[in-house]
């Protein structure tokens, strides 16, 4: 009896030890499973790119690989691949193209307003008729108009080239080395030309006298608005060119003619699609 009791006790202990090992093993498996599952979920989460939450305009997988929304007005639209570093071999940098778009947009906004302003002011009788000319009659090649400025139009043209060339040269220097214009002597105006570190947005008392964009959020909104208006202005200037070639009059006169007789003065009738 004693022997049987000893065997039974040993058997019970062995069974208990085996059960304990099974329970511990299951807990380890469950723990490892949880760890493995967590690691898989973590590595499968895609990184969040800057500007990811944005509207996309005919964006492709390739364009989104280099247009990440960090630039103002970037909606992934690049059907020709102009900003693609792989397509150009790194010759054209997306930021350089964006910088060029901003500069050309600013010129276009000035040009769109300046091309139509003399017509409007002339019609209102605020400037002499000899200066209220359509934009295409004020160029130096060929000379046209009967305005009387302090110098002839050829002299004005050469002077404009010299001044614009100087300004563009300094602008390019600031792009190559941001802030460098604030270190070069320029008639005591260096402090106002130091820039903000972003060549496209120099800021300061000369380029931002009203202090727009004091915080990051408002500055981002203003950058986007500027790009949109610049793009619209570039299209407007293109429209001025086409209108001038087709109708032979300025854009303001085109508008007046259309308002006076919309049926006979519109895009279709001007292009003879009737």
Model-derived features: positions:
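Alpha-helical transmembrane segments and their helix-helix packing motifs
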Residues: 2-274
């Amino acid at each position: 009896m004693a022997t049987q009791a000893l065997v039974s006790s040993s058997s019970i202990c062995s069974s208990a030890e085996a059960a304990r090992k099974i329970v511990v093993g299951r807990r380890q498996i469950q723990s490892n499973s949880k760890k493995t599952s967590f690691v898989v979920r973590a590595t499968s989460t895609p990184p969040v790119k800057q500007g990811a939450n944005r509207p996309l305009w005919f964006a492709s997988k390739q364009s989104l690989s280099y247009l990440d929304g960090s630039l103002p007005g970037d909606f992934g639209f690049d059907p020709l691949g102009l900003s693609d570093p792989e397509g150009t071999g790194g010759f054209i940098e997306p930021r350089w193209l964006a910088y060029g778009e901003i500069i050309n947009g600013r010129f276009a906004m000035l040009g769109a307003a300046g091309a139509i302003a003399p017509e409007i002011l002339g019609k209102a009788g605020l400037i002499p008729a000899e200066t209220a000319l359509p934009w295409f009659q004020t160029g130096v090649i060929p000379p046209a108009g009967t305005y009387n400025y302090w110098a002839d139009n050829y002299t004005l043209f050469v002077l404009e080239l010299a001044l614009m060339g100087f300004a563009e040269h300094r602008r390019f220097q600031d792009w190559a080395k941001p802030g460098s214009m604030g270190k070069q002597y320029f008639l005591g105006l260096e402090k106002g030309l130091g820039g903000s570190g972003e060549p496209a947005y120099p800021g300061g008392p000369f380029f931002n006298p009203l202090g727009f964009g004091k915080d990051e959020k408002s500055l981002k909104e203003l950058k986007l608005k500027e790009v949109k208006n610049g793009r619209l202005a570039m299209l407007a200037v293109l429209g001025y060119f086409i209108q001038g070639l087709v109708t032979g009059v300025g854009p303001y006169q085109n508008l007046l003619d259309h308002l006076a007789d919309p049926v006979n003065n519109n895009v279709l009738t001007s292009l003879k699609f009737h």
